[in-house]
C-alpha cells in the first residue's frame, strides 16, 4: 500500500498562519508516516524570502523523503517564484516513486491570481505519464469549480484542455488546492481532489483546517479528510478499474 498526504495553502509567516495548528498537522502527518507528501501551493502569503524560509522550516519538519511541492498564486507574488526555486527546486517536476508517478506543475502566473498551465507543458506532461504506474497530477489551481466557495473565479484558463489531456493520459488522481474548501469530484475514471487550507485562518463558512490522506492499495483507492489533530473521515472508498 502507498500512502500520500496532500497538504495545501499553508500561508506561512503571514497574519493568517496558525502556528499551533501547524504543529498539530506536522505531528499527525509524522504519525501517519506517508510514502509521499504532496504540497499544492500557497506556501506563503506574499512570496517573500522570509515567508519561504518559514515555509521551508515547516515542510522540512515533516518526516518523508518523497515530497512533491508546487507553487501557488501567492508564491508567485513579488516575483516570488524565484525564491520558490531557491528553496524547493523546479516548479515543474516528475517523480516516479515505486508504482506511483506524480507530476507536479506550476499553474501560477506572476502578478495575477488566475490559473494557467500552458500549451508548452502539454507534451512534457503526456511524456511523463507514459507509464503503467498509478498516475497523480498535482497543481495549485482547481480544475473544476468547488461548491461553497462563492462566485467562481481563477480556475485555469485552459482547464478544459488540461482535463482532456489528463483523461487521454489515463490519469487516476488530480490533487489541487487554492479555494480552501475540501472537495472530491469524479470525472469518468479520474478523481479530482481539492484540499482545504492546512494551517491558516483563511477558511470559508463551516469548513475548518484539514488535509487529505490517499491510500492506494493494489486495486483499491481510499481518500480520507484529516483534521489537524489526526481525526480521519473516509470520503472515497472504491475499487479502481483494472
Report the location of each language-model feature.
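Beta-strand-turn-beta hairpins that frame and shape the catalytic cleft
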Residues: 1-5, 94-104, 130-136, 186-192
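N-terminal active-site segment of His-dependent metallophosphoesterases
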Residues: 1-58
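Active-site neighborhood of phospho(di)ester-bond hydrolases with catalytic His/Asp-centered motifs
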Residues: 7-8, 36-42, 67-73, 106, ...
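Extended active-site neighborhood of metal-dependent phosphoesterases/phosphodiesterases
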Residues: 49-127, 131, 161-167, 212-213
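Short acidic, glycine-rich surface-loop motifs adjacent to enzyme active sites
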Residues: 131-148
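Conserved beta-sheet core of the metallophosphoesterase superfamily
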Residues: 151-220
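A short C-terminal boundary segment appended to hydrolase-like catalytic domains
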Residues: 217-242
